[in-house]
Amino acid sequence: MKTHVKALVVGGGAVGTSIAYHLAKAGWQDVMLLERDELTSGSTWHAAGLLPYFNMSFATTHIHDYSIKYYKTLEAETGLNAGFSVVGNLRMAQTDARMDEYMVYATTAETCGVPYEWLSPAQIKERYPLVNCTDLKGAIFHPTDGYINPADVTMAMAKGARQHGVVIERKWQVDGYHWTGSDWQVTCTKMTEKGGNLLPSEEQIIITAEHVVTATGNHAQRTAKLLGLKIPAIPVEHQFIVTEPDPDLVAWRAEGNPEHPVLRDADAKWYVREERGGWILGPYERNAPARFEFGVPDSFRADLFPLDLERIE
């Protein structure tokens, strides 16, 4: 294993693999990525994968624009499908105030060059008969939005990074960062599996790196403690429900109809999208509990929290 690198990326989720890929694509030689478990095993693998083109921030919208165009090139470059579905995004409104809010969205979208379309309840019902429009005032539709499979896009970026010379090492945990004044001395411990838990072994190495980038997700507070910093990044519990196949939806798609857009109802506080003949329903929760303020337990790996439906009733 290499012990001297130009850039060391810590964390093998969607963010870490993207950083490693882009450094190598920009011409950086000698880049290494470390992941303490398996790629995507942290906060990446179970994300809903919503990928909006439009955002109320001008700068963020341009980042989204780059990302969407980039994801479309990954399969041609790596041979791996990133699971990107451009189905559109329908933001529905139950009140006049919400429609006024969407007018602001529209002006921002025009500034950023993002296409949009206004739809009345009747037009929504004509296009998507399964959508209940009885309480709607209208909607703004963004045809270039969609969703992506987080695990698939991470694996595609990891392969692309390797193709550009990045070395990816799994089962290595960073346990210390020391800045010498000219480079970083990064203490790494080999992780082993015992009884379903991921535990540190006695094998350690020190990697010398000119640059270190941390993308540790759920482990951000541990990273901050190792660096002597305070990072305002705390994982917050989010839940979504994946339904069984919906007979009405299955019949709709069997007739050759297109996939529904991502449906967002800010007044009802839900987003919905299709998933394998059924639906993913995600609530916009208030006061969702924070997690891992003091570190991630050894027993928590690619796991889910217990469902708490009472919190979203």
Predicted regions and their residues:
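Helical element adjacent to the flavin cofactor pocket in flavoenzyme catalytic cores
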Residues: 141-211, 219
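Beta1/beta-strand and adjacent pyrophosphate-binding region of the FAD-binding site
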Residues: 2-15, 32
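Active-site lid/adjacent beta-loop-alpha segment flanking the redox-cofactor pocket in flavoenzymes
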Residues: 230, 246-313
